[in-house]
């Protein structure tokens, strides 16, 4: 590339950044993320690294989708807990009317300070969301879920009435209004979404998300969460092995993936992630079944080391800080995902 082309490239990238926001166009080989963007941790160290900026970006729209019982709500409760730990305020728009406060408390959410609403219609839910955003008082707002945002006309109509594209139009209109307010208020708004199957698809994935196409465009980050296995102790199932693919990312290079454990009643196994990443980054050494840190043996077998880190949170925090330094903006990187498993073609029938 000659000098004139370099100048032209710099000029057009600067113009696009001004017009559409920083990080609109990035070189895929460039591992530098938009570090001036504030982030809220997801509660999963591996996912924070995969996202490139240490968490989910404030002032942006984020979508997380996946099959039933894959960990979508669990992950968002972790995000709320992390925001509250840092003195932030959170709201949960429970369109599914299924929030479990006891489970939320187990994940570290301060339910006394959590603002919850259970709207009757999709219009009401999105109006409440817009009002909360415009107040500027909230750090994170979670909408659970897009599929449950039922238009008023559908609720008031008869069973079996056709309402083609009604929810898609509602989402499109709401997101046009929301996106500017979210940026100005520097609020993270997360939409949890479900997966549907398209009938008669011969080639490609038959899966698509609900609510039309608007959210796919307006979201700065889209995450596909899947359960890939079970964690067992004998015959007893203790939790799920989970994989999250970052299928869209406007604040850091996309297509990264994170794998971690979600334990029943506890949420993300933070200690398990620390062990895995610390060994990969050569912060912790593994010799046979023994693990050592700073030339001192800390346990035999992963479970013993996990218990050691739980009993010594200061050591766990020290190792986590070193991992973040090495991976986020450092010389180490997580592997890319194999590809987007969901069809992103226009589908406004939901």
Curated annotation (Swiss-Prot):
Please give the chief subcellular localization of this protein: cytoplasm
Q: Which domain of life is it from?
A: Bacteria
Q: Can you name this protein?
A: Protein RecA
Q: Which residues bind ATP?
A: 66-73
Query: Corresponding gene?
Result: recA
The record's subcellular location field reads: Cytoplasm
Q: Return the similarity comment.
A: Belongs to the RecA family.
Any GO MF annotation of the entry: ATP binding
Checking HAMAP family in the record gives: RecA
Tell me the function of this protein. Can catalyze the hydrolysis of ATP in the presence of single-stranded DNA, the ATP-dependent uptake of single-stranded DNA by duplex DNA, and the ATP-dependent hybridization of homologous single-stranded DNAs. It interacts with LexA causing its activation and leading to its autocatalytic cleavage.
Q: Which PROSITE patterns match?
A: RECA_1, RECA_2, RECA_3
A GO biological process held by the record: SOS response
Q: Which SUPFAM superfamilies match?
A: P-loop containing nucleoside triphosphate hydrolases, RecA protein, C-terminal domain
Organism, per UniProt?
A: Dichelobacter nodosus (strain VCS1703A)
Q: Which keywords does this Swiss-Prot/TrEMBL entry list? A: ATP-binding, Cytoplasm, DNA damage, DNA recombination, DNA repair, DNA-binding, Nucleotide-binding, SOS response
Single GO cellular component term: cytosol
PANTHER family recorded for this chain?
MITOCHONDRIAL DNA REPAIR PROTEIN RECA HOMOLOG-RELATED, RECA
């Amino acid at each position: 590339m000659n000098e004139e082309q370099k100048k032209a490239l710099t000029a057009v990238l600067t113009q696009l950044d001004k017009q559409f926001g920083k990080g609109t166009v990035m070189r895929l080989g460039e591992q530098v993320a938009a570090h001036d963007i504030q982030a809220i941790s997801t509660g999963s160290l591996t996912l924070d690294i995969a996202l490139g900026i240490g968490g989910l970006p404030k002032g942006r729209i984020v979508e997380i989708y996946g099959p039933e019982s894959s960990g979508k709500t669990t992950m968002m409760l972790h995000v709320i807990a992390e925001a509250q730990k840092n003195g932030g305020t959170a709201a949960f728009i429970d369109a599914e009317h299924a929030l479990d406060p006891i489970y939320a408390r187990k994940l570290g959410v301060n339910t006394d300070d959590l603002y919850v609403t259970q709207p009757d219609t999709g219009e009401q839910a999105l109006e409440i969301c817009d009002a909360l955003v415009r107040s500027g008082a909230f750090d994170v707002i979670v909408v659970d879920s897009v599929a449950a945002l039922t238009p008023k006309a559908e609720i008031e109509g008869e069973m079996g009435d056709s309402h083609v594209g009604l929810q898609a139009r509602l989402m499109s209109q709401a997101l046009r209004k929301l996106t500017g307010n979210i940026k100005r208020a520097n609020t993270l708004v997360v939409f949890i979404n479900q997966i549907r199957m398209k009938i008669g698809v011969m080639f490609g994935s038959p899966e698509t998300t609900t609510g039309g196409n608007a959210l796919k465009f307006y979201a700065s980050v889209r995450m596909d969460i899947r359960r890939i296995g079970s964690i067992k102790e004998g015959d007893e199932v203790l939790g799920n092995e989970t994989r999250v693919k970052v299928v869209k990312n406007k604040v850091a290079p996309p297509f990264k993936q994170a794998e971690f454990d979600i334990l029943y009643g506890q949420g993300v196994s933070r200690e398990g992630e620390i062990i895995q990443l610390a060994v990969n980054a050569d912060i912790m050494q593994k010799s046979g079944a023994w693990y050592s840190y700073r030339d001192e043996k800390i346990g035999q077998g992963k479970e013993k080391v996990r218990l050691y880190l739980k009993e010594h949170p200061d050591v766990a925090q020290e190792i986590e800080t070193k991992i973040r330094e090495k991976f986020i903006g450092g010389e180490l990187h997580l592997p890319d995902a194999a590809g987007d498993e969901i069809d992103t073609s226009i589908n406004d029938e939901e």
